[in-house]
Amino acid sequence: MPREILTVSAGQAGNQIGSEFWSQLCAEHGISKEGVLEDWATDMTDRKDVFFYQADDEHYIPRAVMIDLEPRVLDSIKSGPYKNLYNPENFFYDPQGGGAGNNWAKGYAAGERVYEEVMEMIDREAEGSDSLEGFMLLHSIAGGTGSGLGSYLLERMNDRYPKKLIQTYSVFPDADSGDVVVQPYNSLLSMKRLTNHADSVIVLDNAALSKICQDRLHVQVASFAQTNQLVSTVMSASTQTLRYPGYMNNDLVGMIASLIPTPRCHFLTTSYTPFTSDKIEQAKAVRKTTVLDVMRRLLQPKNRLVSMPTTPSRHACYISILNIIQGEVDPTDVHKSLLRIRERNSATFIPWGPASIQVALTKQSPYVQTTHKVSGLMLANHTNIASIFKRTVAQYDQLRKRNAFMPQYQKEAMFEKNLDEFDEARATVQDLIEEYQACEKADYIDYGAGPGYVKGEDRREKGREAVEG
């Protein structure tokens, strides 16, 4: 029986990515823009039910709830080419309008206000599932709605469905050229929720997405449509084993269990190859796609959809790797490729766990024509992800020393009396950075047991001292 997944998209970026994702899933399953199965879609080995359900008239409808605080993006989806695909009851925007003004606190407060209506939609979809496995939250953490409202939803969904998995696709801001001046505040406050309430976070960032667009598409300035296409390609590939199941990794819990050995270190990076012209216009052609070639390319930093330093720290290493290889692949080729990669020490692993690349083989959609035989997605848990969090903390500290823009946050009830929430968020993220650094050492198994470990109430004081110091 398929384990269903409910997709919740929040804010402008989340809904634009979600819209692109659904158009891609329709193409891969032979579903028309109206939700009708095409006459030529005769392959019945796929599991459409994971992401779609059938209405009484047999139309396929996405298991999706779309939420925003202002109507512009949702209106464009409702009037776009896929307007008849979605359940019209599953669109929500705040009747007060106006959005969150790139303010996490405003988005969070709006979440409290609209909670009942939004949760009614989520509950209805969840109860309509036979065997709900979990949720996918799509959002950005730089602005106001995706970060603030997204954070509130994450907390509430975790409380309401404690036994269901929550995986997020979280777009992190470009640290060097962000257009939201308060993005370090918004990012840090969101990070606390992603650390404490999500089971798995797939980190994407605008800087890496733009760089891939420049490299593959020959465009100086990537449009949102182009970067969203990259993200939807990765989302489609990461859910391929759920929709075209094989012997392994055919549910979300199996994938997460293999990638996340410890609960807090659940931030994953992705790499994908090849981004070729059948997916995105103008993309560079990759002439040869053998299994070895694809698996080598996946380990190259330039194919990552997240910006980590190209020269990582000496001790940086992989905690785990799962390669999802799509296409007609001979398992013996996979075995040979893994041996070659191991011989060349292409990937450095943690000293306290298995040093192995896991591989899941899955077929490509028979309805989407590709120019390559093999494509691959790498989901990886790498200690160097902490460098992104360090950058966020450093930028936060610069603003917080001057209490810059703080009055905007103090207008909301959460920050009226004090700024403890900021201190707690900073301490949570600092703890996370330290845990990823501890993962690089052989004695990580004992981490958290020693006298130097700070937890609970001491976190807030620790965060405040770090900023003032």
Swiss-Prot record:
Keywords: Cytoplasm, Cytoskeleton, GTP-binding, Microtubule, Nucleotide-binding
UniProt protein name: Tubulin gamma chain
Biological role: Tubulin is the major constituent of microtubules. The gamma chain is found at microtubule organizing centers (MTOC) such as the spindle poles or the centrosome, suggesting that it is involved in the minus-end nucleation of microtubule assembly.
Pfam family, one: Tubulin
Gene3D superfamilies for this protein: Helix hairpin bin, Tubulin/FtsZ, C-terminal domain, Tubulin/FtsZ, GTPase domain
PANTHER family: TUBULIN
Keyword field contains ATP-binding: no
Protein localization: Cytoplasm, Cytoskeleton, Microtubule organizing center, Spindle pole body
UniProt key word Disulfide bond: no
Protein family membership: Belongs to the tubulin family.
GO BP term (any one): microtubule nucleation
GO molecular function terms noted in the UniProt entry: GTP binding
Binding site for GTP: A142, G143, G144, T145, G146, S147, G148
Organism: Microbotryum violaceum
Transmembrane segments: none
GO cellular component: cytoplasm; gamma-tubulin complex; microtubule; spindle pole body
